[in-house]
Amino acid sequence: MRYRKGSEENHCERFQEAISVSASSGVPAAYYSFRDDYQSIRMTAEYGGTIRIESIITATGEQGELTQHPQGLIQFRTRRITDSESNLNETCEGPTLLHIVGQDEDGFNVHLESLLARMLRGRSMITLTRNTEAYLRDNTHMLTTVSRDRVNDLVNQLKSPKSSLRRAAVRQLSSYGSSAVPLLRSTLARHDLDPEQQARIKSILANRVRIDDDTPTSLAQLLAADRDHWQILARRMDQTQFVAANDHVLRCGLESLSP
């Protein structure tokens, strides 16, 4: 990874911001802060480590925090400052920001939308999520179907004593593209995998990282076999869309969606 150590600050009448990049034992870390009349934000990120974004709304004191630990889910929570326990506090988690926005769009909009729009060069994370969800609802029949049982069979094949079978399993899993990513991630929770299987799965997942801009179509394929996301989306489906989505989930070998 290429990076440049140093610090930079920007102050004007409307806002103040600062960024600092350092390194310890060759591992870079970044710290960013932003403040205007609306909110203050702090973001810390260590390469290969934990990412944390903290937000405080100036007028209300409402707090938002997004955290992702290495190889872990993204966690997002908002807290209202009250004298008693508030049922307005929200906590959700998921493997992608689309899962987070799908569960707490209002909280994300209050605390993180403006920051993410700057990081995405003006693109709205909420708009991208809405368009992806619309594509999933309206084009369920066009999505790639990858069976969980087939993925598990190929993962088992990764520990075959024959190298030709192991290579064939890697090629087949890789050929599924991003549609197999949620299923491959879930297999890492299995307790019967040997170190070589785990390493091969992680290598396949690492090779699935894309450097081009995400689109609703590409993100929909990534989420095609993600039951958790389908369940989040089910709350905003009509009956016809729900039936089509549930049929697709069952074809992927996943559990039926809850109505």
Residue ranges of predicted features:
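Extended repeat-based scaffolds of very large eukaryotic assembly and lipid-transport proteins
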Residues: 1-259
